[in-house]
Amino acid sequence: DAIMKRKIMVVLLAAAMTGSLAGCGSTQNKNAADASEEKMKVAMVTDSGDITDQSFNQMTYEACKAWGKENDIEFNYYKPQSDSDEARTASVDQAVADGANVIVLSGYVFAPTVIDESDLYPEVKFLALDVSAGDICEKGIGEGYDYNPDHYNVTDYYNEDNVYCCTYQEELSGFMAGYAAVMLGYRHLGFLGGMSVPAVNRYGYGYVQGADAAAKELGITDEVQVEYVCGGQFYGDADITAYMDTWYGSKGVEVVFACGGGIYTSAAEAA
């Protein structure tokens, strides 16, 4: 899944460059000449994690860095000073001040930043990863939102001309993981999620469905069991590690599919 998301990131960056050049080249010759002299400068802003989390932030960082190197494009990353909307917005402000004209936002927590910054910086392209219509509506509407984005025009809350919100079908990766685990001979599976947010839940639901599909195919539905829990955070700690110890120990769990940033460390330590 990380490889697939990395490939998608490369495609999105290429599309951002193409869109930028196309937008600049449709006016007078002088404007086209000026635009040709402007070079793309890419920035990435991390969410609550870091570029060494061996998860979403690190994958995004490495994909941006590799693409920048391959295409001779300057790239920098910014880590907000705290886990807050204000800090993330401040990092975007700093990236723009440093000359970035394509900014990659890593995670659903950037919905408020997309709303606030896309109109403020109309000449900057934003790639918002895992930011869904529901995330935008929840932050844009606030109190009174009925949690059905289909009831609203999401583009009322951000500048659609310079923002691309990219979400993924995590349930497909989850399905393949659950299916493969059962086909490889595991019968007692576990799913450890981070916070119970849509992307994590899609991984989990797919995992359960994949395990169930494999069990039905093998005719062993009464033998396959799945433990399921979300830790409520995107990092491992002693409490979650202890919880995983009970899974591997007294419950007899054989394999754990961990999804949610650094929370995987607790499953790995317990194993």
What would you call each of these model-derived segments?
Residues 29-271:
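A residue-level marker of the well-folded mature domains of exported/periplasmic proteins
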Residues 1-40:
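Short, low-complexity disordered leader/linker segments with a strong preference
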